[in-house]
Amino acid sequence: MTSKGTAAEGILLKKLLEYGIEAEHGSPSRPGDIIIPPNVIIEIKDPKEKSFSFRSHSAKGEAQWKALREKQEKFPWLEVYYVVRFARKEWRCFDFPLEPTPLKLKEGGELDGFFDTLRRRQDALMVGMTVIR
């Protein structure tokens, strides 16, 4: 059995599924660490500190942000979020930033509210699909 993603990805995916949200790991052909059908991409960061810098994280941090920005511009219905596990214990969510500026613990949203929003959207989508059938 091969590993798919980091520990933080696995933990978040489990939390989403337990919350009743359909979600799956991303793949090379589908960008993002976690995909929530039909149009949500979640990118996960797991810094040891209480902030995450796209520039100092690695050479790919800013390039990855740019690639996701281009994808979002090409497909405006895509919703992209960052979920960060700060200092390996405190989870926060962020809307996709307009610039690759640092993400800070005190500026992030709580996961419960984020999960509620995602579940309501999926529930509404399922009701809409049932009506169409």
Can you say where each PLM-predicted feature lies in the sequence?
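Conserved catalytic cores of phosphodiester-cleaving nucleases, focusing on short active-site segments
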Residues: 16, 34-36, 40-50
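Short acidic/glycine-enriched loop/turn segments that link adjacent beta-strands
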Residues: 28-31, 88-90
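Domain-level recognition of nuclease-like catalytic cores that cleave nucleotide substrates
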Residues: 3, 79-80, 84-133
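Acidic-basic catalytic patches of nuclease active cores, encompassing PD-(D/E)XK
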Residues: 1-25, 30
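Short, charged, amphipathic alpha-helix that recurs within catalytic cores of restriction-modification
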Residues: 54-79
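Acidic-residue sensor for enzyme active/binding pockets
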Residues: 9, 43, 64
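Short, surface-exposed beta-edge/turn micro-motifs
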Residues: 31, 38-39, 78-81
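A short, conserved, highly charged catalytic patch centered on acidic carboxylates
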Residues: 22, 28-30, 44-54
